[in-house]
């Protein structure tokens, strides 16, 4: 019995690599992209809860970087560029949307 209690105490003492506030998995509720493993805190509409989501892949809709850290369209995966016409109003309203493309491939 004592050995079982010690084993349980050790198991609970080991820190969980997934955090409550940071290092969140896809689908978990977030307030800022810095909290997500994927670095994208995404919301469907202004009334919905934001959740961690995967970054946009090639030829997918994307958002340019935003100060708010919450996106209606996730930024592109590493190595891709979000081709978007940035506007001041779009930056304020978080509506600067574009398409992810591979800049290295387009130069060839």
Swiss-Prot record:
One of its GO terms (cellular component) is extracellular region. GO terms for biological process: digestion; lipid catabolic process; response to food. This is Colipase B. Residues 14-18 form a propeptide. Its main location: secreted. It is found in: Secreted. Residues 1-13 form the signal peptide. Expressed by the pancreas.
């Amino acid at each position: 019995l004592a050995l079982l209690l010690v084993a349980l105490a050790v198991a609970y003492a080991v820190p969980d690599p997934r955090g409550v506030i940071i290092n969140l998995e896809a689908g978990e509720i977030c307030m800022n992209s810095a909290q997500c493993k994927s670095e994208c805190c995404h919301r469907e509409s202004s009334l919905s809860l934001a959740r961690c989501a995967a970054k946009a892949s090639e030829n997918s809709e994307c958002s340019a970087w935003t100060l708010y850290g919450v996106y209606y369209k996730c930024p592109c995966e590493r190595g891709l560029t979000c081709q978007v016409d940035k506007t001041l109003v779009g930056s304020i309203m978080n509506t600067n949307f574009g398409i992810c493309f591979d800049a290295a491939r387009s130069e060839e």
